[in-house]
Each structure stands twice: as C-alpha cells, then as structure tokens.
C-alpha cells in the first residue's frame, strides 16, 4: 500500500515511522509512506498557505490553492483522499479493516482552524476523526490512523492472528495477558492459563473479555 501524507510539518512524522512495526513494514515492501509539504505548492513568494476566514472569527484557514495542488500532485486514479478532522466519522476497527484493503491512501492533515470547505467538497472522499476532542493539528491523527489500519495489512504483524484477537474484534475488549514470572509480588497467574487445556483457556479468555467489556464499555454490547 502507498500512503501519502500531506501536511505543513513533514518532519513531524520522522520518528514514528522509523521505528518498530511500521519501519519493518516499509522494509518488507508492504507499506510505502511518502511525506509532502503543502507549503511547496503555495503560489506566492512567501509560501503563505493560510488567511483570515470570511465572515470573521478567530484563527486562520488553510487556503484552497496550495492544498488542492498538493493533493493533485500525488493523486492517482485509485487513490482515496482522507481528511483528518474532528468533524469526521469516528475511527473504529471496522473502518481500519476497510482502509487496509486500499491500494493508495492520501491523508490530509489540517492545521489552524481547518481547510477551506471547497477543497473538502471537491477533493476529499472521507473525513475521519480519531475521537471527540481537538488536537493542535492533524499530524498526530494521521499517525494514529496509519498505525491502526496498517496492523490489518497481511504480513505487517508477526503473527497472522494477532490483530484478530485485539480489543474490538468480535465486539469485545481484549482479555488479560500474563507472562513470566508465574508469581510476581505475591500475585499469581490464573491457574487455567497454566493448565494446557486450550478449550478451557479459550473459554476463560472469552469470559474475561466479556466481563471487561461490561464493566468498561457496555455500549459495545448494546
């Protein structure tokens, strides 16, 4: 998959994409991440990309010209353009699975008060929010989105069933996990996990996942 990220701060992404799972996914050719600076497409000598909003109000709005040019520069016929925005539909595991099937995604990061609506109307296919809160810019949201859906790309995770057993898969939160030592500060690993009985272990894990979901996220069971 190819992922183009358009923002005003491409250097923001260097660390997260150069470590751990996302780094290995790129090295294996499963994921290609390209960064584009929207300022490079400004048609003025000061590379200005924002201006005051019509109608008044606080803050600045990203102008349509540089954003549109940046999108069109990387866009292909099969590309899907996503704008990271608190006004978008809230991201969930189902959406992550859907995005993992795409061949080319363009992630548009907003800054200031947002982007001129004409760009969203003409160039953007979908707006996605990572939660009901506001960040200083869309870069963090793009990192979260990319990390979340990339886990569903075949081969990205070490074990093929790893993503299938995570929280929200099957409509439940994840079950508790334990590793060595068997006893730590007086707390022991549940006996069922030491039994070797895979049927009982699976039953216990489902019960624990259901219990945690009922306590913390009962809305998932509604």
Swiss-Prot record:
One of its GO terms (biological process) is tRNA N1-guanine methylation. GO terms for cellular component: cytosol. Keywords: Cytoplasm, Methyltransferase, S-adenosyl-L-methionine, Transferase, tRNA processing. It catalyses: guanosine(37) in tRNA + S-adenosyl-L-methionine = N(1)-methylguanosine(37) in tRNA + S-adenosyl-L-homocysteine + H(+). Pfam families: tRNA_m1G_MT. One of its GO terms (molecular function) is tRNA (guanine(37)-N1)-methyltransferase activity. CDD domains: TrmD-like. Its EC number is 2.1.1.228. S-adenosyl-L-methionine binds at residues 110, 130-135. It is found in: Cytoplasm. Transmembrane segments: none annotated. Belongs to the RNA methyltransferase TrmD family. Homodimer. HAMAP family: TrmD. Specifically methylates guanosine-37 in various tRNAs. This is tRNA (guanine-N(1)-)-methyltransferase. The lineage of its organism: Bacteria, Pseudomonadati, Chlamydiota, Chlamydiia, Parachlamydiales.
